[in-house]
Amino acid sequence: MESLLAVQGQDFVLTASSSSAVRGITVLKPDDDKSQILNSHNLMLYCGEAGDTTNFAEYIAANISLYTLRHNLNLSPEATASFTRKQLATSLRSRKPYQVNILLAGYETNLGKPELFWLDYLATCVRVPYACQGYSSFYCLSIFDRYYKPDLTIDEAVRIMKLCFDELKKRMPIDFKGFICKVVDKDGIREINI
């Protein structure tokens, strides 16, 4: 019962991931960070099968670091999403495909704009202004539809996230143990408290 949320603002992407690691009815870890920093301006949030998620996230991070070392070039969010999608597509054709759903948030430093990508385990990749993965999409997409606008400020995005958190607390029969929220902008990636 993992939840990932993200919304793109004027010059940032605000992300949130549920902080509990749950297996069945048992909470295994109350402070599980479901994100992986890929480089200074790319952040990947992931959910899915427990072993697959961590393994795939570390694999992508290591390969992006290797590319950066070899070519002395940081991948853009779009290039990172394309590479990640290719790896999911290749895995899908194997005997043991990764069962991982992803939100990829990044800031394109050359163009000075934020980008958000939604990827699923079937290697679908879509650029979106806001996104959800997991059961949260049943309740939060309508909130994003209602309140999203392209020129969101960070305060407005935080308010929308709070509305989503309140709706999930009200509707979901599970306690997510809070959310870990991060911002990706021109200054890089930082964690914030909401």
From Swiss-Prot:
Q: Which domain of life is it from?
A: Eukaryota
Task: State the InterPro entries in the record.
Answer: Ntn_hydrolases_N, Proteasome_beta2, Proteasome_bsu_CS, Proteasome_sua/b, Proteasome_suB-type
The set of disulfide-linked cysteines is: none
Q: Where is the signal peptide?
A: none
Q: Which SUPFAM superfamilies match?
A: N-terminal nucleophile aminohydrolases (Ntn hydrolases)
UniProt subcellular location: Cytoplasm; Nucleus
Q: Which Pfam families match?
A: Proteasome
Alphabetically ordered keywords of this record: Cytoplasm, Nucleus, Proteasome
> Which GO CC terms are listed, alphabetically?
cytosol; nuclear envelope; nucleus; proteasome core complex, beta-subunit complex
| One BP annotation, GO | proteasome-mediated ubiquitin-dependent protein catabolic process
Entry similarity comment:
Belongs to the peptidase T1B family.
Query: What is annotated about its quaternary structure and interactions?
Result: The 26S proteasome consists of a 20S proteasome core and two 19S regulatory subunits. The 20S proteasome core is composed of 28 subunits that are arranged in four stacked rings, resulting in a barrel-shaped structure. The two end rings are each formed by seven alpha subunits, and the two central rings are each formed by seven beta subunits. The catalytic chamber with the active sites is on the inside of the barrel.
- Main function: Non-catalytic component of the proteasome, a multicatalytic proteinase complex which is characterized by its ability to cleave peptides with Arg, Phe, Tyr, Leu, and Glu adjacent to the leaving group at neutral or slightly basic pH. The proteasome has an ATP-dependent proteolytic activity.
Name listed for the protein in its UniProt record: Probable proteasome subunit beta type-4
Q: Which organism is it from?
A: Schizosaccharomyces pombe (strain 972 / ATCC 24843)
- Where is the organism placed in the taxonomic lineage, from the top? Eukaryota, Fungi, Dikarya, Ascomycota, Taphrinomycotina
